[in-house]
């Protein structure tokens, strides 16, 4: 029983929403990381930038409408957090700034982000509720299960919306095709009748 539970916890641990990335930022460029996030989700992140004298890196977190959710200049190491208001694609950008007179070199940037369930402090919850370690793991497992179910529900809803949009688009294309065909037939009929009258007027045909 315990082994089965540990296997389940391991599987759900692989599904955790903790994302870590490391990259090199070229001088005087910016790199943005984008991800779709559900509405009303807490997003927490931790970053660290290699120190290069005279070079500056700023970061900014925003949505597709350009609303700034978190921002800081001259970063080296720190944390940030924001809450998504609506379902949208949110991006975190790191911007390198090097003075014109200085020869810049690439800087290493590491970023770890958590969202939703993984932002909870289960150790603190366990201490406050006086839960055993196994009970804390079960609580984490329950929250992860609920989160995955909600994500699947949202995905299903989006799929239905996309299918409805696709069906409406197909109906409009079909209507436009029929309308275009009718217009072409009408134009062809008018042209035949016009040419017939023209040739009769010129006495080219009876």
UniProtKB/Swiss-Prot annotation:
A Pfam family of this chain: EMP24_GP25L
Question: What biological processes does GO assign it?
Answer: dorsal/ventral pattern formation; endoplasmic reticulum to Golgi vesicle-mediated transport
Which residue windows are transmembrane per the record?
173-193
- Name-wise, this protein is Transmembrane emp24 domain-containing protein bai
Tell me where in or outside the cell this protein is found.
Membrane
Organism of origin: Drosophila grimshawi (Hawaiian fruit fly)
Assigned keywords, A-Z: Developmental protein, Membrane, Signal, Transmembrane, Transmembrane helix
Give the Cytoplasmic membrane side ranges: 194-206
Domain of life, per the record? Answer: Eukaryota
Regarding the membrane, this protein is recorded as: Single-pass type I membrane protein
